[in-house]
Amino acid sequence: MIRRAKLSITFGVAKAGVYILFLNFRRHRLVLLLIGLAIIVGASLPPFMTASYLTRQQTAAEVRALESLRIMTRGGVLPSEDVVARIESDFPRTKAAALARLIRARIRINAKDFAGAASLLDSSVIGDHSLLADYALFMRGSALEQAGKLPEARAAYEQLLKSYPTSLRAREGALRSANIMLRSGDAAAAPALLKDLAAKDDASALLLTAKAYEQAANSTRALAAYRRLYFYAPAAAEGAESASAISRLGSTVAPAKPDEALARADRLYEAKKFSDALQSYNEAVAKFPAATNSQAQLRRVIAAANTRKIADALNALNAIPASAGDTRAEALYYVAQTYARTKQWDQARATVEELRRSFPSSPFTPRALVSVGQIAEDANNEADASYFLRTAVNSYQGSVEVAQAQFDLAWMSHESKNFSESSRLLTEHLAYYADKNTDNRGRAGYWAARDSERAGKLAEARALYEAMQIRYDANWYGYLAKQRLDAMLRGNKAPAKSFPSDSVVGRAFANLQTVTVAEETAGAKEDKAIATADELNNAGLDDWALEELARASAAVGNSPKVNLAIARIYRFQEDNVRALNVLKKSFPDYSQMKPEELTREQWDVFYPLSYWDVIVQESRARNLDPFQVAGLIRQETVFMPRARSSARAYGLMQVLVPTGMLTAKKYGVERTITEESLYEPRLNVQLGTAYLRDQIDKFGRIEYVAAAYNAGPIRVVQWRTSLPSEIDEWAEAVPFKETRGYVQGVVRNRLQYMRLYDVNGKFRPEVGMRAVTGQSPASGAPATQPEDSTVHKRRVSGDESEE
């Protein structure tokens, strides 16, 4: 009936000021709901939003005016110009005035009053009082261009290039100026303007350069530009024009030199167009055999592996000498995987053995053993899987590359009910691998304890159950561990025992206590980008804001500060899933962090809570725990009221129209149930909680209910009879990975909401009090981290996470 949206996984906004009152927002009810929420925002905004970058302190009234502008322009909406003009006049020579002027220009552009927009933008107010002078200049050029004033537009674009060469709008300004040159009969001037972009093989710049030369009757240079486009930017859409143009100018697309041939192949490879890349590499090798080096042959191997062309992969591998070291090792790694994926196990084993023999110290050797073993495991080839995984673990003990293999071996022992062996291996995983790779840490922690208990190692079991309460108390495996620990203590089955810190259990205990956060890598340049993005968001230009932050992120990786700024914009757009996913790159272990260790804004991204009054009312009406309902909503949609799944489920609790109709009829809800009505939070929660009540009455345990909500009640009826009866084993045995994660998530989310929020839906006092990044909610002072902290700061890739 209800299906989870296909989502990978608000700000309280504040009273927006009197200017909103002038707006007719009947068509925008969401905006009206936000009015009355900029005093709170003004108090919670980061420093760059509450103090001018020009060192002038903003007044409370100006902060409210800025938030009014932000809310007015939310979601692409443009208000009445009169309201915005009033803000501009009431706050002269301020950021509010500058952004109001920019919004007024947007309003006129939207009304096709391009000359009026250009006139508004012909002022120093935006440049003097905001960070958006380059954007204003670009918008002025665009308005002039649309008004047909091409010379003035060209001058504006070229002024942008001169004054703000590093602006994100500079490239587009150059392209537009060049287009104007071609349209105005001044094509000969375009190549010089585009020289820097063309030198970077910018496809649009190369195409315009070629067209400019062709229009200027310089066919030699036109052909050179088209060929450059064909060979050096083949993956771009503009590249499609180059082949026909080359033919039209009397030439062919055959490479004239090795650099051209390899450049085309490399660019296609970088764009992951592996089939085309392989063809280009093969052509390059055939025509210029002496010019292809080992790195090119490696890329040829990888392209062939991705298209499962084993013969091409072997030809390329044979061209890489042993003296190439890790380059040949990496090639062997890909060839071994290709053999495994095509179930040529003998050849896969021979390739891996060559790696072990020739490159025993290369990181690609353990990676090959593990990846081939996992491919065998997925293919139900237990013999080869066991061989490769055991060889990896025995040969590279303690190496991060074999962490997953070691866990897989431990799990094989668990599934074969060899609890003495599985408990040993799982505890060793915690002791020797979990500090390097936390992918399976919580799972290993619980099952190491559970299997130790089954094997009669009660002291070890108790110690590990207790360790799980430190960081996993609000997570699925900590929830299970708490139940087992309570049972042990009630029965007085295991006296407390202290294990030496250097023992296996002692190391395991210690490794269950740590979490990782990304170290802060942002500096002054990124701070300015964040401030610029905030001003763009304030003016309703979210796409440009996200471009600014994407450039900052590319420079500094997973900076918590930059990722929070990105998440802040997504939250403002009510795209809570994207907000969560971007911020967790900086906090991969966020669900194991204590309430005081993250700021309230960070927790609000990870565990948003909206419509609390509705949730409480409807939960009480159905005798449900409102925190459980909130946990289910978070798992379904992360509180996105207009979420829609591929299964055509709608709204916060993902209700299907047919089921909504049946539920409404059963419970006397006198509403017409449609797709649009299911987006209404109250109706959706009313129907969702009614359905949830039915499922609880039917299945009892929330674990079964969650599985039914995600995979359907019929499957759960079958699973309850065919899968293990104990709930911990049952949840592991559910055949759908998505449903396993869903069950765990629903339980985890309830525990998280209970520890973060009080019964009124407000953060508990301790939340954010000792945040490892950001500021203390009480003092506003930078947060400090104690020397003995179990929070480890390091650079993170953004790929690691465990919930």
Where do the language-model regions lie?
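Short, flexible loop segments at boundaries between secondary-structure elements
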Residues: 739-740
